[in-house]
Amino acid sequence: MSDMIRDFFKMESAGGILLVIAAAIAMVIANSAMGEGYQAFLHTYVFGMSVSHWINDGLMAVFFLLIGLEVKRELLEGALKSRETAIFPAIAAVGGMLAPALIYVAFNFNDPAAIQGWAIPAATDIAFALGIMALLGKRVPVSLKVFLLALAIIDDLGVVVIIALFYSSDLSTIALTIGFIMTGVLFMLNAKHVTKLSIYLVAGLILWIAVLKSGVHATLAGVVIGFAIPLKGNKGEHSPLKHLEHALHPYVAFAILPVFAFANAGISLQGVSLAGLTSMLPLGVALGLFLGKPLGIFSFSWAAVKLGVAKLPEGINFKHIFAVSVLCGIGFTMSIFISSLAFGQANEAYDTYARLGILMGSTTAALLGYSLLRLSLPLKKA
């Protein structure tokens, strides 16, 4: 049995599978006799914050730290290093954020409260999308994996900017000042070629507390810390960035994201009607993900190639691009996260319907995206 468990965690798709399981368990519990206990647990206060708050602001800061590390590595030595390799996924990502947001706004423009959720379908769940792609194993060209990874990373970077600009509450000048000082300290450490990770993490913890108290969303501290970690070590040392990225990845994939999914996907269907499910808010979210993502990514990619602005990566055709663009409609954890920022406890009914829209759109995108990708790829060689 232990060998089976070990083999499971070695699978590329394991993280995505765990996300599905965690979300499914949460939905079952939330709609059972244990539903009240589930909600009571999430709203239990520990050290001044609810369990839900610790997960969304604390654990997710670690997830965003990993995103920061990945983005920096890709910018310095990966798929985003040169203009030639970065421009195609960058253009695709812009389309993939713009079209879903516009579809959502088209459905909800006359509701001032609902319009706050315009960014919900703009996000892509990188772990889930890569997990679905990994189910097809070696049939997937490396260049297609790199395209999806680069696109999703740029998408995540866009989400970080959106959170910073549009989903930050009343700001505390003192806390912000401390945050800016700690940001300066982190990058000064980098400039002085300090490579000891513990120093960055202690400074980063102080930054996280300052950002948490400032009114800017605390997860952004994770991105700043990630960008401050040096890529290159001193002579004879391993890369601090790669070391931390490698160390964090299993915890994020197999613990943090499943815990986040469990804490946020448990939606009680009590009182939810068919009329509510087909109302403008969930429809805007679901169609933004399921239709907006492929429409934006594919059309912007096609236009970029036809106008000579970018080239298709080697070994990839437009059938592959369309299949991947549908997969990018899996918003799931990232979309749920933005929904909690847009509506949260202030408008729980809107948050519930937004999350139902996320589940509908993401599930449809996952099933169709997998099917299209499977059809577009060559059969596995014997």
Swiss-Prot record:
This is Na(+)/H(+) antiporter NhaA. It is a multi-pass membrane protein. Activity is regulated by pH. Active at alkaline pH. Na(+)/H(+) antiporter that extrudes sodium in exchange for external protons. Can also transport lithium. Contributes to the survival of V.cholerae during the stationary and exponential growth phases in a saline environment. Coiled coil: none annotated. It catalyses: Na(+)(in) + 2 H(+)(out) = Na(+)(out) + 2 H(+)(in); Li(+)(in) + 2 H(+)(out) = Li(+)(out) + 2 H(+)(in). NCBIfam families: NhaA (TIGR00773), PRK09560.1 (NF007111), PRK09561.1 (NF007112). GO terms for biological process: regulation of pH. It is found in: Cell inner membrane. The keyword Cell membrane applies. Induction: Induced by sodium, lithium and potassium. Belongs to the NhaA Na(+)/H(+) (TC 2.A.33) antiporter family. The gene is nhaA.
